[in-house]
């Protein structure tokens, strides 16, 4: 039975032919589905009109790529207008387990302080690797902990990706929604950290599972070393590097365990890119340009400040946080 108290918000950007099957799976678990499309071309619009127009599905066509943050905020505003208090946010290529919404909702209903919950997040299974990702939470002093979310337990965590998360719409309205000038990358992390500065909690629900694709990950062997790079395009390296600067400035001292993790993770994924990915020169230029623009406070859509030598990557409609310290 679908949960009529939950509205799904799916952000699309040139959805692939397998999207309708995932849409059907989501629709069976929620009361309504809102699709917010960032594609901005006739082919994608025709595809969605042919597969997504049903009684319980509504499509918002943005006409261009407004970024994942703006798309999520538009979806959240529409869900509130429809009377919903909770929304399930999803990327177009994420696939929930059959009981994911039921598991998230059950924990929400049993929580002693539901009014303090900003997000309930499922266990993330990386579809390309077939293994669970780890969460981040504070350890001793400034150290961080990277627990696996196993069994039926729940735990408070520092960050969660937007895809698969049950989003409290009252909390979303309370502290201003997702940061649209980030466009993409760190959108979910910034929202989680800001929520906690306002007294809200981020809760991981280990019984709920989401199968999620992080970039175009595949195994690369370098002698005895096995790496799993994401193969993001230069434009993603630009926004990652640019948005990291205001994140560290605003949250580094408040969340020292996150800052330590961020420093290590950023160094690792850059080294991994240099070792195992193509277009290294273009990506290094994008990192330098993004860092410079971040220092100058130049945010917004990346095309306004940086031209990607390789064009726009196909994953540009997403905002993955992922698990960068996972080889």
Label every PLM stretch briefly.
Residues 62-82:
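Glycine-rich, basic loop-to-helix element that forms the pyrophosphate-binding segment
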Residues 249-327:
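Non-catalytic, C-terminal membrane-associated alpha-helical segments of glycosyltransferases
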Residues 84-95:
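Short beta-strand-to-loop acidic/aromatic patch adjacent to the donor-nucleotide binding site
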Residues 10-31:
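Short, well-formed alpha-helical segments that are part of the catalytic scaffolds
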Residues 37-47, 64, 94-95:
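A conserved acidic beta->alpha catalytic loop
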Residues 201-285:
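Active-site-adjacent helix/loop segment of glycosyltransferases
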Residues 165, 171, 175-176, 181-211:
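A short, conserved alpha-helix in the catalytic core of glycosyltransferases
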Residues 99-134:
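Conserved donor NDP-sugar-binding/catalytic core segment of glycosyltransferases
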């Amino acid at each position: 039975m679908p949960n009529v108290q939950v509205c799904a918000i799916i952000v699309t950007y040139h959805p692939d032919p397998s999207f309708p099957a995932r849409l059907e799976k989501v629709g069976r678990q929620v009361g309504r589905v809102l699709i917010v499309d960032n594609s901005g071309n006739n082919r994608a619009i025709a595809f969605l009109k042919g597969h997504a127009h049903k009684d319980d599905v509504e499509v918002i066509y943005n006409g261009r790529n407004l970024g994942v943050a703006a798309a999520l905020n538009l979806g959240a505003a529409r869900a509130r207008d429809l009377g919903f208090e909770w929304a399930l946010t999803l990327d177009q290529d994420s696939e929930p387990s059959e009981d994911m919404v039921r598991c998230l909702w059950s924990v929400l209903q049993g929580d002693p302080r539901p009014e303090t919950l900003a997000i309930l997040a499922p266990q993330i299974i990386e579809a390309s690797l077939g293994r669970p990702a780890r969460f981040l939470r504070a350890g001793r002093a400034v150290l961080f902990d990277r627990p696996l979310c196993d069994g039926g337990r729940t735990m408070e965590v520092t960050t969660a990706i937007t895809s698969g998360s049950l989003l409290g719409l009252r909390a979303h309205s309370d502290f201003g929604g997702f940061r649209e000038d980030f466009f993409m990358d760190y959108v979910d992390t910034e929202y989680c950290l800001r929520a906690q500065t306002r007294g809200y909690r981020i809760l991981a629900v280990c019984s709920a599972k989401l199968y999620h694709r992080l970039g175009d990950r595949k195994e690369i062997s370098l002698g005895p070393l096995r790496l799993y790079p994401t193969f993001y395009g230069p434009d993603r390296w630009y926004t990652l590097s640019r948005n990291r600067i205001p994140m560290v400035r605003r949250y580094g001292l408040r969340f020292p365990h996150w800052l330590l993790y961020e420093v290590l993770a950023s160094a690792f994924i850059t080294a991994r890119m240099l070792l195992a990915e193509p277009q290294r020169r273009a990506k290094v230029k994008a990192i330098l340009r993004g860092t410079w623009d971040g220092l100058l406070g130049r945010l917004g859509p990346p095309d306004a400040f940086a031209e990607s030598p390789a064009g726009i990557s196909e994953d540009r409609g997403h905002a993955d946080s992922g698990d960068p310290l996972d080889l």
